């Protein structure tokens, strides 16, 4: 599964930073 951001692009949700996906940048 991947998470996509308009400004950041797409990343795997198993990446180390995945926890940020649940928080506003």
From Swiss-Prot:
Source organism per entry reads Felis catus
EC number of this enzyme = 3.1.1.3
The protein's location, in the record's own words, is: Secreted
Assembly notes: Forms a 1:1 stoichiometric complex with (pro)colipase/CLPS.
- What gene name is given for the protein in this entry? PNLIP
- MF terms in GO: all-trans-retinyl-palmitate hydrolase, all-trans-retinol forming activity; triacylglycerol lipase activity
Could you tell me the keywords of this UniProt record? Disulfide bond, Hydrolase, Lipid degradation, Lipid metabolism, Secreted
* GO cellular component terms, A-Z: extracellular region
Return the protein name: Pancreatic triacylglycerol lipase
Enzyme type, top EC level:
hydrolase
């Amino acid at each position: 599964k991947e998470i996509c951001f308009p400004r950041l692009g797409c990343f795997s949700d198993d990446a180390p930073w995945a926890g940020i996906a649940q928080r506003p940048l």
